[in-house]
Amino acid sequence: MIHAYNKSYLSAAQKNLARMLDYLVNDLHYPLETAWQWFVTSELSARFEQGDCSVLVGLSGVELARAVLEQAGEVVPMQKPSYAYDRSPEYWTGWALAYYQWLTSLRFAEIKQAVSITKVRLLYTPYHEMDVRQFADKMNELYRAAKPETNLKAMRTLAGLSQSELAGQADVPVRTIQQYEQRQKDINKAQAETLLRLARALNCNVEDLMEKVPPLNFK
């Protein structure tokens, strides 16, 4: 699995996203859903998930929160953050989501579309007491339940093509397309030439066809 960025930045990234959510929700009293929506739709979110060091480690969590507010067109308060002895559920939510995004390389918007921030927050008990990898396994399960079809099928449907039409345009056997869509074959292990042909026919990037979350039933 290809991770979003170098692991050496992960710990700082987790702490900063955690502090950002904690500050916005518990110090500034914004709803969790609103705070997360502001972040996900901001330019900072894209830079974060791509491993931009100036965002991952160049800003503190509070500075990140203030930058998100500024991009959302909100008043940016100078209120000092509180530092509770116990980490809040919102802090854990940001911390865990940063790990999951790094692990899968999914965009935060993709995660949000499949699993709402409220649902992630509800995983605080019992997952905050477990290894974060167990949280990631649960997120994979929720993601796949919300998005059972492959990216190839989703892109083909979006393009309005049948399997046979895609096979003809991409010069790829229809049986191969069926096997990828049914997860009988792992598209991540497909030959580069096959992926390029499919991507050209679907007018998308090769990355758009790759599966970043392991299927629940793939052997």
State what each model feature region is.
Residues M1-L103, M130, F135-E141:
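C-terminal alpha-helical interaction appendages
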Residues C53, V172-N188:
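Recognition helix of helix-turn-helix/homeodomain-like DNA-binding domains
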Residues V57, K185-R197:
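Short, basic-rich loop-to-helix N-cap that marks the start of a DNA-contacting helix
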Residues A65-A72, A192-D208:
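DNA major-groove recognition helix of helix-turn-helix/homeodomain DNA-binding modules
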Residues D137-G160:
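A short, Lys/Arg-rich alpha-helix, primarily the initiator
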Residues L152, Q163-A167, I177-Y180, L209:
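Conserved hydrophobic/aromatic packing and binding residues within compact polymer-binding modules
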Residues S162, P173-T176, Q191, N205:
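Short coil turns linking two alpha-helices in DNA-binding domains
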Residues M210-K219:
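Short, charged recognition helix plus adjacent turn
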